[in-house]
A protein has these predicted regions:
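Short, surface-exposed beta-strand/loop "edge" segments at domain boundaries and coil↔beta transitions
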Residues: 61-65, 106-110, 137-148
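A structural detector for beta-sheet-dominated domains
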Residues: 102, 113, 135-137, 148-150, ...
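Short, hydrophobic/proline-enriched secondary-structure or compact coil segments at domain edges
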Residues: 127-136
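ATP/pyrophosphate-binding catalytic subdomain of soluble kinases
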Residues: 28-100
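Compositionally biased accessory segments in Actinobacterial proteins
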Residues: 75, 83, 130, 141-143
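Flexible loop/N-cap segments at domain edges
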Residues: 116-124, 128
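Extended, well-ordered protein cores
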Residues: 1-49, 141-210
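Short, structured protein-protein interaction patches enriched in aromatics and acidic/basic residues
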Residues: 88-118
Length: 210
């Protein structure tokens, strides 16, 4: 359902020893790089320890809802930050999908929201990520980090205590999958980061054993 069965199928293949390369994961590379680079800023380095919420918006053309790419993106964050699932992903009353994860005793809300989009081309594909937002809070600092899909680029911004401290853009690849397929053929070994992200993604959708 909503592409989530595919994630579990890939996970079973990886756990069975097969080498799996996923184009959706490759398409998330720029999203991952931009989000991670925001926290290289001296003011933001320690703010991930105070993360309170993760939100990912995905394209929903018509009524076609696909969540797998967003779940894999959240799974990557969970693997990097060593987050554990408290409440698996489930649909809320307002057509969003929510979950709760934790770092130690600190709980972090997760929200995946299908949205209508105006762009043409790749971003209109169901499940394409159009926005990712992280919010962190501690007694003397509030942090908001966003990566947003524009027409032909991704824009990353970070606001710390009301001040803009990061703003950078990166051009997007074309929608053609040929470069990703060629890259997959060139790789012969397991992708450790992908396997770790996939494991957390499967846990997020309800497999509490992983």
């Amino acid at each position: 359902r909503h592409g989530l069965t595919r994630l579990k199928g890939m996970a079973d293949a990886v756990y069975g020893g097969l080498v799996v390369h996923d184009v959706s994961w490759m398409r998330l590379m720029l999203w991952r790089e931009l989000l991670a680079s925001c926290f290289d800023h001296p003011l933001l380095i320690r703010e991930l320890k105070h993360l309170r919420s993760i939100r990912v918006d995905v394209a929903r053309p018509g009524g076609d809802v696909r969540l797998s790419r967003a779940v894999l993106y959240v799974g990557w964050l969970m693997s990097r930050l060593r987050l554990q699932v408290v409440e698996p992903l489930h649909e809320s009353d307002d057509e969003t999908w929510v979950a709760v994860v934790r770092s130690g005793k600190r709980r972090i809300g997760v929200e995946i929201r299908p949205v209508e989009v105006e762009f043409s081309g790749a971003v209109r594909a169901a499940g394409s990520v159009v926005r990712a937002e992280l919010e962190a809070h501690r007694s003397d600092a509030d942090t908001h980090v966003n990566v947003t899909r524009q027409a032909d680029h991704l824009l990353a911004t970070a606001v710390w205590n009301g001040a803009s401290v990061v703003r950078r853009a990166r051009a997007l690849e074309t929608f053609d999958e040929s470069p990703y397929l060629a890259d997959s053929l060139d790789r012969t070994g397991h992708d450790r980061l992908f396997a770790q992200a996939l494991e957390k993604a499967v846990a997020l959708v309800g497999d509490g054993t992983r």
